[in-house]
């Protein structure tokens, strides 16, 4: 008899072009996307095992662009975990993680735990080796401060390009979703 998988829904939000889709692409398909295409809505399903528990993880990729703000709230329904992503080379995306994305997640899905994820971690190393680097990287301590301020369960960084930390992000997110007590009717709901 096959083992029944626990189902979990993960929703990733953040500014457009911050690296959300690349993260999901690398995690589910094992390779970095060759071209950037703005996301409207994409769903992926993958099976994984965390702490000996088989999990069917549904991944919801959302559009960060303003023109999709009216559609995005539908993705929050019954979310078990929210990833808020920002690009480590774009301080404004961290500010938006705190002011826009955390507020939106808490409004539509107040009981879902949040993990704050710094994306494009490889750019930190690249900037370190550039003599005249003009792009200012988000200090890790600033990101940790934002994570605390929004009540995130964890702050993590990863690079979809190199693969560093990608599996760790989803392991922590899945584990966090499993640790949350599920009360009947405690899932996120949307009233329109």
UniProtKB/Swiss-Prot annotation:
Location within or outside the cell: Cell membrane
Q: InterPro entries annotated for this entry?
A: P-loop_NTPase, Small_GTP-bd, Small_GTPase, Small_GTPase_Rho
- S-palmitoyl cysteine: lipidated positions: 188
**GO annotations of cellular component type:** cell periphery; cytosol; membrane; plasma membrane
Q: Where is GTP annotated to bind?
A: 14-21, 61-65, 119-122
Q: CDD domains from the entry?
A: Rho2
Q: Which chain positions have S-geranylgeranyl cysteine-type lipid attachment?
A: 189
SUPFAM superfamilies under this entry?
P-loop containing nucleoside triphosphate hydrolases (SSF52540)
What keywords were assigned to this record? Cell membrane, GTP-binding, Hydrolase, Lipoprotein, Membrane, Methylation, Nucleotide-binding, Palmitate, Prenylation
Give a GO molecular function annotation for the protein: GTPase activity
EC number(s)? 3.6.5.2
PROSITE patterns xrefs: RHO (PS51420)
Q: Which PANTHER family match?
A: RHO FAMILY GTPASE
The record's misc note reads: Present with 3870 molecules/cell in log phase SD medium.
Subunit structure and binding partners: Interacts with BEM4.
Return the protein name. GTP-binding protein RHO2
**What's the encoding gene here?**
RHO2
């Amino acid at each position: 008899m096959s083992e029944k998988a626990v189902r979990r829904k993960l929703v990733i939000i953040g500014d457009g072009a911050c690296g959300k889709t690349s993260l999901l692409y690398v995690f589910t398909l094992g390779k970095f996307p060759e071209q950037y295409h703005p996301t409207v809505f994409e769903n992926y399903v993958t099976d994984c095992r965390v702490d000996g528990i088989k999990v069917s993880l549904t991944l919801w990729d959302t559009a960060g662009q303003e023109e999709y703000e009216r559609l995005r709230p539908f993705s929050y329904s019954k979310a078990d975990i929210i990833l808020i992503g920002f690009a480590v080379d774009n301080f404004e995306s961290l500010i938006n993680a705190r002011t826009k994305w955390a507020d939106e997640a808490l409004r539509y899905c107040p009981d879902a735990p949040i993990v704050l994820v710094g994306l494009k971690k490889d750019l930190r190393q690249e900037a370190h080796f550039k003599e005249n680097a003009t792009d200012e990287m988000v200090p890790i301590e600033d990101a940790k401060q934002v994570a605390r301020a929004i009540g995130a369960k964890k702050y993590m960084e990863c690079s979809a390009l190199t693969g560093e930390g990608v599996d760790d992000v989803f392991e922590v997110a899945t584990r966090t979703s499993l640790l949350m007590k599920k009360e009947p009717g405690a899932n996120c709901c949307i009233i329109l």
